[in-house]
Amino acid sequence: MNLKHIKAVAFDLDGTLVDSIPDLANAANAMREHLGLPPLDPERIKSHVGDGIASLVHRAITDERHAEADGPLWERGYRFFVQRYREHLADHTTVYPGVRDGLGLLRALQLPLVMITNKSERLAVPLAEQLGLRDHFSLIVGGDTLPEKKPSALPLLHCCQVLGIQPQELAMVGDSANDVAAARAAGCAAIAVGYGYADASTLGADLTVNSIAELYDLMKNG
């Protein structure tokens, strides 16, 4: 895929820039204990990640991808989860190898970088700050920043508008079906990372890279 026309790059957060499963799983299991439920294996919680904290709380309570918890139970769980997770955002969350260097290389190409995540903005921004990633991004759009989140095209189109570029000039880099679907809906290039939470071969992206440095090489060489 030729990337010469790309003028900006958007990145997902969880599973793309950072591995946050340890802290998400700890918060989810602390919430389950608070609600009188037994703990879940972190791999189960990993399978529930990707649609924001509200959905994760439903799934962590029910242990079902498409089920919703009873309203009052969800509210208790949500309040507990957010407080617990906010207090332990980066205890065990790690930046994937090569991410910092890769972001620096892309910025050296004078490409604006934005973050588009389904994690709420009030959690995504401090997490990026604590991990030393915030300064790489000119804009961070969380799952609650706009009326719609991925897989909606809205977050991507919003970034295009802010940056003054056309949708086809934005590349969306992520690890999930939501990232690819949002890119498709917006008319942006869809790039998957091969190391994320999902099997990249199942996502139907335009391109799969195994590091951000690999993406830099492709963009530098057109």
Swiss-Prot record:
Provide the taxonomic classification: Bacteria, Pseudomonadati, Pseudomonadota, Betaproteobacteria, Neisseriales
What are its E.C. numbers?
A: 3.1.3.18
What family name appears in the similarity comment?
Answer: Belongs to the HAD-like hydrolase superfamily. CbbY/CbbZ/Gph/YieH family.
What residue range is the signal peptide? none
Residues of the active site: 12 (nucleophile)
> What pathway is it annotated to?
Organic acid metabolism; glycolate biosynthesis; glycolate from 2-phosphoglycolate: step 1/1
What Pfam family does this protein match (any one)?
Answer: HAD_2
> What keywords is this UniProt entry annotated with?
Carbohydrate metabolism, Hydrolase, Magnesium, Metal-binding
The protein's name in its UniProt record = Phosphoglycolate phosphatase
For the ligand (Mg(2+)), the binding residues are 12, 14, 175
Top EC class, one word:
hydrolase
Taxonomically, which superkingdom? Bacteria
Q: Which reaction does it catalyse?
A: 2-phosphoglycolate + H2O = glycolate + phosphate
Q: What does the UniProt record say this protein does?
A: Specifically catalyzes the dephosphorylation of 2-phosphoglycolate. Is involved in the dissimilation of the intracellular 2-phosphoglycolate formed during the DNA repair of 3'-phosphoglycolate ends, a major class of DNA lesions induced by oxidative stress.
For activity, the cofactor(s) needed are: Mg(2+)
Does the entry feature the keyword Magnesium, yes or no? yes
Q: Which InterPro entries match?
A: HAD-like_hydrolase_sf (IPR050155), HAD-like_sf (IPR036412), HAD-SF_hydro_IA (IPR006439), HAD_2 (IPR041492), HAD_sf (IPR023214), PGP-like_dom2 (IPR023198), PGPase_prok (IPR037512)
Question: Tell me, which GO biological process terms does this entry list?
Answer: carbohydrate metabolic process; DNA repair; glycolate biosynthetic process
Instruction: Name one molecular function that GO assigns to this entry.
Output: phosphoglycolate phosphatase activity
Q: Which GO terms describe its cellular component?
A: cytosol
